[in-house]
Amino acid sequence: MRRRYPRLPPLPRAKPRGLLPLLPLLLCLLLPCLLASQDSGPERDAWQRPAEVMDALGLGPDMSVADVGSGDGYFTFHLAARVGPAGKVYAVDIDEGELKKIRRRAKADGLGQIETVLGARGDPRLPAESVDVALIVNAYHEMRDYDAMLAGVFRALKPGGVFGLIEAEDEPGKSRASYHDRHRMPAEVVREDAARAGFRFLREAPGFERPEGRKEFYFLVFEKPQDISAVIPSP
């Protein structure tokens, strides 16, 4: 004989209170934007001080400059404003998606002085002696073929050209792979690499500190000697 149990009424459904049930979804959508805000626009300007960077490199109107490892173009557009319509800015990156963003914005803003260059992992693919200034910002630690990349930057600079490199400081004595993973690079390692490529160290400009002290950045300034025969032997 089948036992019959009393039929219970259905439990009442909880009614959502405003946007509270949607809060996790909203956080997932907004968090990347909040984190990215420190890497662009006025928030980044406040700690990276792009005008001071360009002053330290001696960049002025009508000059040519390469932004190597440009990403989505934070520095590219500051450089374009400094050199003006008669200048030239090469935005170099190995990510075509980032370069598309730069081209789209440059077209919208009427910045014909910006040219994107799809580089290779060991070659910025810039014309020889084409730029007065080259800049690498927070990207050198990502470069596995660093000697080849610096050789390409050296080749692209005009004699007497200036090369600036901004990177997050780290302790020396670790492997290159660890620097890549930690997104940092000791200043002394950069100086050794640059000297090997033929650059002459000029000075260390004032560095930068990320919000909340998460990272401290140094700023090294080098020069391509006027007489490169002194650093590159004749074949």
Protein language model regions, located:
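Conserved class I S-adenosyl-L-methionine
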Residues: 62-71
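A short acidic, Gly/Pro-enriched loop at the edge of an enzyme's catalytic core
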Residues: 63, 124-134
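Conserved SAM-binding motif I beta-strand of class I
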Residues: 88-93
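A short glycine-rich, Lys/Arg-flanked "PGG" loop and its adjoining helix->strand segment in the class I
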Residues: 80-84, 147-162
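C-terminal alpha-helical "lid/dimerization" subdomain adjacent to the S-adenosyl-L-methionine
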Residues: 155-216
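Conserved SAM-binding strand-loop segment of SAM-dependent methyltransferases
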Residues: 109-122
